[in-house]
Amino acid sequence: MHMKKSLIIIALSIIFTIPFIYQPTYAQEKYYPKVENLQGKEQLMAELDELKRVRENMSTINITSDLDSEGLKRTNQYIATYLTELNSVRSDLETHRVNYKNSFADLYFSEQIQFIADSYIISLRQQQNLLSQLDKNNPDAKKLFESDYLTPTYYYVTLGDQMYSYIVDYFSIL
C-alpha cells in the first residue's frame, strides 16, 4: 500500500513539474517568397488569370480510344484553340519582359508565369501526339491509360497546376 502511494506521488510530481521544466515553443511565422515593386503587376496578374481560365477549359478535352476521324479532328481543333490562347499569353509575357527589362521583379515573376504556360502547352502537344497515334490506329495508343502516351500529358498538366498553386498560395506579391 505504501509502495502504491509512493508511485502515485511520484507520478503526480512528474505530471505537475514537466510544464515548468520545458519552455513552450510557438509556431514560427511562415516565410513566403516576396515579389516586390512589380511595375507591371496588373498585366502579370491578368496573364495569371488567363492561364487559370484556359486551364479550366482544358478539362473539357475528352479523348477516348473509340473516337472516329471526325471526333479526332474536332478534339484537335479544341486543342489548337487552347494552344493559340496559351501562345498569346506567352507572347504577352515576352513583350512584358522587353518593356520591363530593368525590373528584376517583373522578369522573375513573368518567368514563373511562363513556366505554367509552357507546361500546359507541352501537355496539349502530348495530347495532339496521342490523337495522331489514334488516327493511325496505333494499338498502344488505343490502350490510353495503360499506354505511354498519357503519362507525359498528366505530368506536364500537373506540373503547371502545381506551379500555379505555388504562386497563388505562397507568393507574397507586393
Where are these regions (language model features)?
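C-terminal amphipathic alpha-helix
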Residues: E29-N76, S119-L174
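A general, composition-driven signal for non-globular sequence regions
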Residues: T17-I18, D49, T60, T84
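Long, charged/polar, soluble alpha-helical segments
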Residues: S69-N76, A80-T81, E85-S91
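Sec-dependent N-terminal signal peptides of Gram-positive bacterial secreted proteins and lipoproteins
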Residues: M1-Q28
